[in-house]
Amino acid sequence: MAQFPLAERAVAALGIVVWPMIEFEADDAIATAAARADLDPDVEQVVICSPDKDMAQCVRGTRVICLDRVRKKLYDEAGVREKFGVLPSSIPDWLALVGDDADGYPGLARWGAKSAAAVLAHYEHLEAIPDNPAQWAVAVRGAAALAETLRNGRDEVILYRTLARLRTDAPLAESIPDLEWRGADREVLEPLCNELGATGLLERVHQWAVVESERPGSSQG
């Protein structure tokens, strides 16, 4: 926790917009920014650079996609469906059933990735899944046991879904143009690197932001 302020200083010095969050998670900020950019006609495509499963719910067609930098793979809507077996809109329901260790909720017993995908591919959301497995329109192995677990755990699985759903109303003040990277801030980054004894990092900066006084045609008075 003590390193968070330092991390914010370092990121800001690199010229990257920082979004401090209160009552929101970092993923909520990313989801909010992606949703806003999706509505902006000047934005050609939104790429979310995260391998986190919950970010898949933000994917929209081929316009809003996810990049797994470790596996070097892009996921559009078809890719999400291929990977998880459900549409992006069903990802929170899928995570609620399966669980997500990264976010600290266990999912429901007996439910696995394949069974959750098979059921949600048809019903899409938890509320639409009948309590009686005889009424299920899909054939799933162990349906009776799965239905019993779901029936007895409706309240908790709805809570898990609430935790899995990303918010798109985070208070981000910046507009899309404000987010454009213009280079690192030399006046801030150089003293910070000196303070940390990491001056070698300065050699890796390939673009410095132009301060107003250095812009062509600018005047000081």
Model-identified regions with their sequence ranges:
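Extended two-metal-dependent nuclease catalytic cores across DNA- and RNA-processing enzymes
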Residues: M1-A173
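Low-complexity, acidic/Ser/Thr- and charged residue-rich accessory regions of DNA metabolism proteins
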Residues: N152-G153, V157, T162-G221
